[in-house]
Amino acid sequence: GGARRRRPTAILCRTTMGKGVSFMEDKPDYHGKAASGDLYRQAMKELGQPDLVALAAEHKKAKFSAARAVEPLEAVLDLGAAKVYGPADTTDNRSAFGSALAEVGQLNYKKTGRAPVLVFDCDLAGSVKTGEFAKKCPDNFIQCGIQENTTATAAGAASAGGVVSVWADFGVFGLAEAYNQQRMNDVNRAGEKLVLTHVGLDVGEDGMTHQCIDYVSLMSNFFNWKLVVPADPNQTDRATRWALKTAGNVCLAMGRSKLPALCANGKPLLARDFTYGEAVKVREGKDAAILALGAMAGRAVQAAELLAEKGVETAVYAVSCPLEIDERALTEAFQTGTVLTVEDHNVVSGMGSLWLARAEELGLHSVARRLGVHRYGDSGPSEEVYAAMGLSADKIAESLEELKKVAR
């Protein structure tokens, strides 16, 4: 009931390690080390707690299986109808995700027999596009504030309770910062749906501190996570609906900028069922092939059109599942004799390294090169940032032309 000051207050506390147990106080020896025998009994006596040694001995006699298998379950959901984005529709993948999430959420909100969709947020609903869901399903939206590590744990734990647990955040926060918590979600066979926005170089003026250029490599360290990097709004919509229903941990990763739907002859190429592990050919070509990660497929198609003007017909594959290598697409690409992988990810540890390593294991032969992020990116409009990194359409075309010279 005292007076409140309208300014920040810092409270400093001096604590005592091992407080309450005389032989432990101010000694680091017992950090991670249990007292045993007479010392344990003395500690329990000083703390006023019961001696549980006899009970523990009885528990040790019980028989437990050496291991138990935990099988994540597919959610019972009405996924609604996928939206179609046409040639005139330019939007960002974030908005396509948010729209699909809100629709599925509303279709199943408080419906008997349907899995509840629970969405977690860390003060970024406007940026990660979960605001529409919050309006339509207010009781299923949890605002956690700026507590990314806690939220990663909570979202993973919630998935064990029979709900579809979704957490959307920037890539650097949801994965890079909360890496160990996501690792534990993998260990525990959770069912979190992690949506990472602002990945790669596509963060605008926020610059290098917010450029998550290692998400593929971080996810590749896990054994059970599925990673999807949609190529355009159509694929984002379908991948979102697929992820919400799919058992286990699933990560969707996308950038910030608006981009057109990938089309051919005025028809959307990715307005089709999403299949995990499929690299979709979005442009035909016999002279060379580009394997492009996620939204880089759009720039790769533009590069292929520039190359076509010079008589080089280049196939383009939209690689949306970098951890699940499509060996059919990889083999097809290598049959052209010239393969360029393109990604706005650390070039050393991204999709290119994974896919070319697999090509070697399969005994595929071709001139191949990786194109990607080779230093921390700049701060500025995305198009300028990509150009400075050598990842604009014209720079991609130049890189492939140079590679073709090596192939001769």
Predicted ranges, named:
Residues 1-253, 258-259, 393, ...:
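Thiamine diphosphate
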